[in-house]
A protein has these predicted regions:
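Structured-RNA-binding interfaces characteristic of tRNA pseudouridine synthases
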Residues: 1-245
């Protein structure tokens, strides 16, 4: 039995997240169907993590086991003929049996995209959070440093969710603007459910003047979701990269 690592890009617009669900289209379902067809046996994929409905991935990582040798250099081309056009395998690599896409991941980077629009943008609605008001980018950038480091991010998950360990480390958080588009990029050792979208919403509130940058440490220390910005839309979120040793 051999283990293979796939890097997968997908447009999450028409899927109910990554994880397989009964009677609902998901990315995992489409991947497993394609792989099972290719190898003529049931294949299960194990992702670096689950993405929610509407969330995209530039480079999701999964692994699977199969008792066949794969020509990795051309596997992406062949398997993509069995996948829908909104999912693509961009690389294939044979790995050791000890490799695990989820438990071996050391860093993940997410990208959140915001479009500053005066009117609704039909062409960007599936790929950006649409923002109809001006934002102070300098203040948003100033707030980033308060998120970096190891903190208990309990405030940055939904209030009705339970999680034993809510301590995470953010290695880098940045805000950049290019014309009418804003890119929030965050790298960490792991993220709570909705954490990136809540951080993005909090930075938007900083940009609107609703939250002062220097108030971020107090919000983190409070461990209460009530002080944060809202959870921004899923369609602006992209899993950009997953790093391993």
């Amino acid at each position: 039995m051999a283990r293979y690592k796939l890097t997968v890009c997908y447009d999450g617009s028409d899927y109910y997240g990554f994880q397989r669900q009964n009677n609902l289209p998901t990315v995992q379902q489409k991947l497993e169907e394609a792989l099972s067809t290719r190898f003529q046996r049931q294949i299960t994929v194990h992702p670096s993590g689950r993405t929610d409905a509407g969330v995209h991935a530039i480079a999701q990582v999964v692994h699977f086991d199969v008792d066949s040798e794969i020509k990795t250099s051309s596997f992406g081309y062949s398997i993509n003929t069995l996948l829908p056009k909104d999912i693509a395998v961009t690389s294939c690599e044979k790995v050791s049996d000890e490799f695990h896409a989820q438990f071996g991941a050391k860093r993940k980077t997410y990208l959140y995209k915001i479009c500053l629009c005066k009117i609704h943008s039909p062409l960007k609605r599936k790929y950006f959070h649409i923002c109809f008001y001006d934002l102070n980018i300098a203040k948003m950038q100033d707030a980033c440093k308060f998120f970096e480091g190891e903190h208990d991010f309990r405030a940055f998950m939904l209030a009705n969710e339970e999680k034993e360990n809510t301590v995470r480390t953010i290695y880098a958080l940045s805000v950049e603007q290019a014309d009418d588009e804003i890119y929030i990029r965050v790298t960490g050792n792991g993220f709570l459910h909705n954490m990136v979208r809540i951080i993005a919403g909090t930075l938007v509130d900083v940009g609107r003047g609703r939250i002062a940058p220097e108030d971020i440490p107090k919000i983190i220390e409070s461990k209460r979701h009530v002080g944060t910005g809202k959870t921004l839309d899923p369609q602006g979120l992209y899993l950009e990269s997953v790093e391993y040793i």
